[in-house]
């Protein structure tokens, strides 16, 4: 049976009550709620449940694709893999996006913040094997669980746009795009040497090979030749590289640099070394960025898969054995760079194109067949790798670049690497002696090109993207293999090719091969029996275009609706980890250009702005066992003593009362048992506190060191805000003041009576409007998410210390509280919106408060008085007072005058800040 799951109905986070407050909350209805600020203590669980139920009911975060008077804003965090449980990295990532989304809504934007699920992948397959359950069932159960957890965070997500990439409704469109690209020649199939993971039985991209091992299994990677489908990403290499210029200042510079290096455009010369083999003339073609060193070539090296190596293998068992050994290694450049350089002489030679001398051909493990022609010219005197190899095998080393005397002075004692790799004038190069790089390049090209022995060439480090994976849980590749017609694409009307979802894999290869009803089909071309392709797409294919599908997730006739895409794309702010710099982010840029060329989207880039958030770290606690192994313990199982700075100084295991070692602060991980369950933390402190903590503790783009003890700070702050609001509400009730009148004055600065305000009331208004302006700048211009929390805390302190002694001062206090709550609702939406509603405001229609410039004007300022640089007093004066008057006033102050016993040498006035009197002796 072939069947598939659809996303289940959205789980309601709140099941025990319906919201009791309408959207238009009045003073009367606010007081009837069981969480009234006049009658109850701060209870985050009740408040957050009520607000989440309200948001689910009124669907205020759903947005339309129809034209709007409001400007649009698309905020997106990289969507999660449905592992089943949120971790604190998720919490931080999605809180960042949500804070920005809520801020821009208050600023008058129509904000789309969607959520979906990166549903395909190896973890689901592994879990299915372990639990003997279909990956589809495991995946969609996890989606239901994680959706509920995300809703507990109070994220302002448009859930109507939700999808999972493992649903046919989604992946049919990447199958469709694959067919369009196949028609254009941008998809092709070839036999390729690949990284093969012998445990997971799949091909790995170079980026997925770490220290010669598979990134998931940890198995040593082998080389294997298999047929694979490729996306011709190199056709877009120039555009991918050049368009990075558009992203300067909008993306982190390190990500741009990583992509530039990964694409790796090199300008140089292709040189042909002629040879004869078995009576036939041919040439060994090599690419070099240093043709000025051509006269220093003393050997050439080829990959084990190169035709010359294969020829030599057929005639020499030792060479055959060496080539076989090379093929077992990784094909990732990073691994080859770290591996020991080894090789074997083939006994073959090629002719140097300039000197006519015979040059030996070696097979070397550091040469990749998949890069360039699979051959390199070796210049040991001027290349570190070649020098290492030549020294090891006693090959000639010929200097052809002049080496400055200072170079030898800089060489550290005991450093055997004497290759000089800089550019300089040529020596020992015959007619090219004395030339610099450019001159030698031109002269050699002029001599060799007419003989068809060289040509200018641009080469890329980037290689075409192999997307075939020998896994079950992925999107089927829509191709058919026919005995008569060969490889044939599936007809568009037969899409999607649906993946069977009732399969329980056993870990031995791809189970699709063993499902006759999936494999057996008819050839679209000749109608004869044929077999479906059983490879599935690399899961990076799904994540390369999901951002665009969010614009029109329910469109059944288009991959992306052009009108919707024009409204929402590009993504205004994308948020995710820097570890995706050269995989997901590069592939998404590539796919955007592919979709643009299919007239599905406009513009050249998918993400206008990128933020790479820092990792969440936590302390580790462990014991070293007698056998040398290490056991790590969860913090919940440890009693920890902290010093005054919040650092752990003593840790005791609860179960036996014995000490454990306090380890390093490291990235949260299962292996170190130092992860923190967001659910437990939310249950204890509430989601608002967790949100505040994750953004207040460190800048969003830097690492966050988690501390359970430090959560008390944001929690106490939220409780303080609750107390301030409660006391203010009681004062309003006692004064019999109308909330409608107060709110009108707060939301309309012109309606606020500011005549004759006390000094304290003016100071509170000034602090309020300074905070409004600062947070607006921090979020809207600087993308600084931690400093606004500090500003809110400072404003709350001012409010807490302010005592209103009149109706006018109660109005000032009300204004400050309302503005505080509006800004707080960006970070802590549950308490912020709840208190605003209790105070009679409709949170759906609220805007970010406007700065009242008149409130920033100071009637009096406090200036510091110094004598010889030491503070001796203060004085309140009018701003921009006359400097001479300030000097006289400062000298006259009793606390200052006693320090002026000597001759006054100098008086310095720093306008509106200080007066410094310099006295002799």
From Swiss-Prot:
Q: A Pfam family name for this chain?
A: tRNA-synt_1_2
> What Gene Ontology terms for biological process does this UniProt record contain?
leucyl-tRNA aminoacylation
Q: Name one GO cellular component term.
A: cytosol
Question: Might you give the EC number(s) for this enzyme?
Answer: 6.1.1.4
Q: Which residues bind ATP?
A: 670
Task: Indicate the enzyme's highest-level EC class.
Answer: ligase
Q: Which HAMAP family match?
A: Leu_tRNA_synth_B
Entry-linked PANTHER family: LEUCINE--TRNA LIGASE, MITOCHONDRIAL, LEUCYL-TRNA SYNTHETASE
> What is the recorded name of this protein?
Leucine--tRNA ligase
């Amino acid at each position: 049976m072939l069947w598939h799951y659809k996303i289940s109905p959205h789980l309601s986070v709140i099941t025990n009550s319906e919201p009791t407050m309408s959207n238009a909350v009045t003073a009367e209805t606010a007081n009837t709620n069981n969480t009234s600020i006049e009658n109850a203590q701060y209870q985050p669980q009740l408040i957050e449940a009520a607000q989440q139920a309200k948001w689910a009911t009124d669907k205020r975060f759903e947005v339309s694709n129809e034209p709007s008077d409001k400007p649009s804003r698309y905020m997106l965090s990289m969507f999660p893999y449905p592992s089943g449980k949120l971790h604190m990295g998720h919490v931080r990532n999605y809180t960042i996006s949500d804070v920005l989304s809520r801020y821009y809504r208050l600023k008058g934007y129509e904000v789309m913040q969607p959520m979906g699920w990166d549903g395909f992948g190896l973890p689901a397959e592994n879990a299915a094997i372990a639990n003997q359950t279909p990956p589809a069932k495991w995946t969609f159960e996890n989606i239901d669980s994680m959706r509920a957890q995300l809703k507990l965070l109070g994220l302002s997500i448009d859930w109507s746009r939700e999808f999972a990439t493992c649903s046919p409704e989604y992946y049919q469109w990447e199958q469709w795009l694959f067919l369009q690209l196949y028609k254009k020649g941008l998809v092709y199939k070839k036999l390729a040497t690949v990284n093969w993971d012998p445990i997971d039985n799949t091909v790995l991209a170079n980026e997925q090979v770490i220290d010669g091992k598979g990134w998931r299994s940890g198995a040593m990677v082998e080389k294997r030749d298999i047929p694979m489908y490729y996306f011709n990403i190199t056709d877009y290499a120039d555009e991918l590289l050049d368009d990075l210029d558009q992203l300067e200042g909008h993306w982190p510079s390190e990500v741009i640099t990583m992509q530039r290096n990964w694409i790796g455009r090199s300008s140089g010369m292709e040189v042909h070394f002629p040879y004869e083999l078995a009576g036939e003339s041919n040439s060994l073609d090599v690419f070099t960025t240093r043709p000025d060193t051509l006269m220093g070539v003393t050997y050439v090296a080829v990959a084990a898969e190169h035709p010359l190596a294969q020829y030599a293998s057929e005639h020499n068992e030792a060479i055959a054995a060496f080539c076989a050994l090379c093929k077992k290694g990784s094909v990732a450049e990073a691994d080859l760079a770290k591996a020991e350089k080894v090789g074997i002489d083939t006994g073959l030679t090629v002719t140097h194109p300039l000197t006519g001398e015979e040059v030996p051909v070696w097979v070397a493990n550091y040469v990749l067949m998949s890069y360039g022609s699979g051959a390199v010219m070796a210049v040991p005197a001027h290349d570190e790798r070649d020098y290492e190899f030549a020294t090891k095998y006693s090959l000639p080393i010929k200097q052809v670049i002049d080496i400055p005397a200072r170079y030898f002075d800089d060489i550290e004692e005991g450093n055997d690497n004497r290759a000089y790799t800089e550019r300089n004038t040529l020596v020992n190069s015959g007619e090219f002696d004395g030339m610099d790089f450019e001159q030698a390049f031109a002269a050699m090209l002029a001599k060799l090109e007419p003989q068809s022995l060289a040509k200018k060439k641009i080469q890329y480090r980037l290689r075409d993207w192999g997307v075939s994976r020998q896994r079950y849980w992925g999107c089927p590749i829509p191709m058919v293999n026919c005995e008569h017609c060969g490889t044939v694409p599936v007809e568009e009307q037969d899409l999607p090719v649906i993946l069977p979802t009732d399969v329980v894999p056993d870990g031995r290869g791809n189970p699709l091969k063993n499902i006759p009803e999936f494999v057996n089909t008819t050839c679209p071309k000749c109608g004869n029996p044929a077999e479906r392709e059983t490879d599935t797409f690399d899961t990076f294919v799904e994540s390369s275009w999901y951002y665009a599908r969010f614009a029109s997730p329910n469109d059944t006739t288009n991959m992306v609706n052009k009108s919707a895409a024009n409204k929402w794309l590009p993504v205004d702010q994308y948020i995710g980890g820097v570890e995706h710099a050269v995989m997901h982010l590069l592939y998404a840029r590539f796919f955007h250009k592919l979709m643009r060329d299919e007239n599905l989207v406009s513009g050249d880039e998918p993400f206008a702005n990128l933020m790479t958030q820092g990792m969440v770290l936590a302390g580790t606690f462990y014991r070293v066992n007698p056998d040398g192994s290490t056991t790590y313990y969860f913090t919940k199982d440890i009693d920890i003593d902290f010093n005054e700075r919040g650092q752990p100084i003593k840790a005791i295991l609860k179960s036996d009362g014995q000490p454990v070692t306090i380890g390093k602060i490291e990235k949260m991980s299962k292996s170190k048992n130092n992860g923190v369950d967001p659910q437990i933390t939310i249950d204890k402190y509430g989601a608002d506190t967790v949100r505040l903590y994750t953004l207040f503790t460190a800048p969003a783009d830097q690492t966050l060191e988690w501390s359970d003890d430090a959560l008390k700070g944001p929690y106490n702050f939220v409780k303080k805000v609750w107390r301030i609001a409660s006391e203010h509400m009681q004062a309003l009730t006692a004064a019999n003041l109308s909330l409608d009148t107060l709110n009108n004055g707060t939301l309309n600065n012109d309606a606020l009576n500011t005549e004759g305000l006390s000094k304290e009331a003016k100071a509170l208004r000034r602090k309020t409007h300074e905070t409004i302006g600062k947070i607006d700048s921090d979020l809207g211009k600087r993308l600084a998410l931690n400093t606004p929390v500090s500003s809110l805390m400072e404003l709350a302190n001012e409010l807490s210390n302010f005592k209103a002694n009149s109706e006018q001062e109660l109005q000032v206090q009300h204004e400050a509280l309302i503005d505080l709550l509006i800004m707080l609702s960006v970070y802590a939406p549950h308490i912020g919106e709840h208190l605003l509603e209790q105070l009679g405001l409709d949170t759906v229609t609220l805007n970010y408060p406007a700065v009242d410039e008149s409130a920033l004007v100071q009637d009096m300022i406090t200036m510091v008085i110094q004598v010889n640089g030491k503070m001796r007093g203060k004085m309140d004066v009018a701003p921009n007072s006359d400097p001479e008057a300030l000097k006289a006033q400062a000298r006259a102050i009793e606390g200052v005058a006693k320090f002026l016993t000597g001759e006054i040498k100098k008086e310095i006035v720093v306008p509106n800040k200080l007066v410094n009197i310099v006295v002799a002796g």
